[in-house]
């Protein structure tokens, strides 16, 4: 039987065949949910989804868009925020 820490929905289960011919269950943590816009809640494009150790391996410009508020707001909300800032000057 699996260890108590694996008996929940946190882990993804996969069957692997080991060299001895047996099938064993391997456990892997699930991917985190997709990033969403902080203002409207729309799913963000160009922001990868993965565990922190996977994201750490990417270069800085692969982690998020290189523009103001990249990775926080969607393009439409970013446009609105920039317009509002420019008009308040």
Curated annotation (Swiss-Prot):
User: Which keywords has UniProt assigned to this entry?
Assistant: Ribonucleoprotein, Ribosomal protein
Q: What Gene3D superfamilies does the entry give?
A: 6.20.340.10
Q: Does the keyword Iron-sulfur apply?
A: no
Q: An example Gene Ontology cellular component term from the record? A: ribosome
Ranges for region Disordered:
1-29
Biased composition annotated in UniProt, kind: Basic residues:
13-29
Q: Name one GO molecular function term.
A: structural constituent of ribosome
Family that this chain belongs to: Belongs to the eukaryotic ribosomal protein eL34 family.
Name of the protein described by the UniProt record: Large ribosomal subunit protein eL34
Name the source organism. Methanosphaera stadtmanae (strain ATCC 43021 / DSM 3091 / JCM 11832 / MCB-3)
């Amino acid at each position: 039987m699996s260890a108590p820490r694996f008996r929940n929905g946190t882990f993804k289960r996969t069957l692997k065949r080991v060299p001895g011919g047996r099938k064993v269950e391997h456990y892997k943590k699930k991917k985190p949910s997709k990033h969403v816009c902080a203002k409207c809640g729309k799913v963000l494009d160009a922001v990868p989804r993965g565990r922190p150790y996977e994201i750490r391996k990417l270069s800085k410009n692969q982690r998020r868009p290189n523009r103001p508020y990249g990775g926080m707001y969607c393009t439409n909300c970013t446009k609105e925020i920039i317009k509002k800032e420019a008009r308040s000057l």
